[in-house]
Amino acid sequence: MADRNSIGENAAALIGNTPMVYINKLTKGLPGTVAVKIEYMNPAGSVKDRIGAAMLAAAEKDGTVIPGVTTLIEPTSGNTGIALAFVAAAKGYRCIVTMPASMSGERRTLLKAYGSEVVLTDPAKGMKGAIDMANQLKENIPGSIILAQFDNPNNPLVHYQTTGPEIWRQTKGTVDAVVFGVGTGGTITGVGRYLQEQNPGVRVFAVEPEESAILSGRPAGPHKIQGIGAGFAPAVLDTKIYEDVIRIHSDEAIVMAQRLSYEEGLLGGISSGANVAAALQLAARPEMAGKLIVTCLPSCGERYMTSPLYTDIRESAMALAVESLEANLKKLCLHNYDIME
């Protein structure tokens, strides 16, 4: 993983060793303590940088892919596609991403900025629609491959090899519980396995959207928490690794993501809000008194400026206009003071 004290071989060498920080204001008065791993500080901006690089490296090692020859195709809610696009650009691969049209405009723009081609699918079909489209494209494009994040064992493996050890080292082995949103299930599976090998007492909790709580035995449905709640149980997810599932409504995740930015200075995306909301629920339990709960901020809020996360803020920002000093001072509640020209 990334060595921040030397020059990287290429951009992919900068992945990992992301920082951790305590949540302070939002946990005030709660029995437990919460810390977050800031995964949006990976070079392409999300936790998925880890699996994008790992899956491609494994395919290169076994000769499945060749730079400049193989076309990479990947169905994604956005972040894995961006991670693959970033690694593909660094290593010289053509990359095609299929994703539901409901994903944010920033994701489409980022994918194209990295040189990838984007194919949108019916949002009503969720991730299954994107997966079906990717499979159809693979059948028709010679020399193409799907790295298949939902099925690829290198997905949880890289979290077992990197994210888990980083959390253990950064917490000096004092982590008591981890809680992660389930998209592919790679993070919770890999991190959970590693930490429970170090300390079988570490508790693991999953997070899913209230509106699409399939891990809780409910039907799949539309929701706004991009990156989790794929609508099915992925093959790489170890459902025995977690003891319970915490359901977070999209609206709660959005509010928490907003609070994270203006109360903690952490600009996370909607799934970051879901993770922290779940972690705070755990921290509020009496049995969590004095315990350290760890979660992650999977991606940055800048990736969601056109999403429901920032609708009100975006509209307010776009409505700003050039005004006089007096008008600005009145807006800033300084109308009782003399105006100095």
Swiss-Prot record:
Task: Give the pathway listed in the UniProt entry for this protein.
Answer: Amino-acid biosynthesis; L-cysteine biosynthesis; L-cysteine from L-serine: step 2/2
Which transformation does this protein catalyse, written as a reaction?
A: O-acetyl-L-serine + hydrogen sulfide = L-cysteine + acetate
Query: Gene Ontology terms, cellular component aspect?
Result: cytoplasm; striated muscle dense body
- Give the domain of life: Eukaryota
The keyword 4Fe-4S is annotated on this UniProt entry: no
Q: Which residues carry this modification: N6-(pyridoxal phosphate)lysine?
A: 48
Keyword annotations for this protein, in alphabetical order, are: Amino-acid biosynthesis, Cysteine biosynthesis, Pyridoxal phosphate, Transferase
User: According to the UniProt entry, what is the EC number of this protein?
Assistant: 2.5.1.47
Q: According to its UniProt record, which cofactors does this protein need?
A: pyridoxal 5'-phosphate
One Pfam family of this protein, by short name? PALP
Gene Ontology biological process terms, A to Z: cysteine biosynthetic process from serine; response to hypoxia
Q: Relate the outcome reported for changing residue 272 to F.
A: In mr29; susceptible to high levels of hydrogen sulfide
UniProt-recorded Gene Ontology molecular function terms: cysteine synthase activity; enzyme binding
Task: Please describe, based on the UniProt annotation, the reported consequence of changing residue 88 to V.
Answer: In n5522; severe loss of protein stability
Provide the tissue specificity: Expressed in AVM sensory neuron, BDU interneurons, pharyngeal I1 interneurons and M2 motor neurons.
UniProt keyword Transferase present:
yes
Q: Which residues bind pyridoxal 5'-phosphate?
A: 79, 183-187, 271
The UniProt-reported impact of residue 229 to E is: In mr33; susceptible to high levels of hydrogen sulfide
PANTHER family cross-referenced by the UniProt entry? CYSTATHIONINE BETA-SYNTHASE
Q: How does it assemble?
A: Homodimer. Interacts with egl-9 (via C-terminus); the interaction is enhanced by hydrogen disulfide and activates hif-1-mediated transcription.
- Quote the function comment for this protein: Catalyzes the formation of cysteine and acetate from O-acetylserine and hydrogen sulfide. By metabolizing hydrogen sulfide produced by cysl-2-mediated cyanide assimilation, mediates resistance to P.aeruginosa infection. Mediates survival in high levels of hydrogen sulfide. By sequestering egl-9, which in turn promotes hif-1-mediated transcription, regulates behavioral responses to hypoxia.
Q: Which family does it belong to?
A: Belongs to the cysteine synthase/cystathionine beta-synthase family.
Kindly provide the name given to this protein in its UniProt entry: Cysteine synthase 1
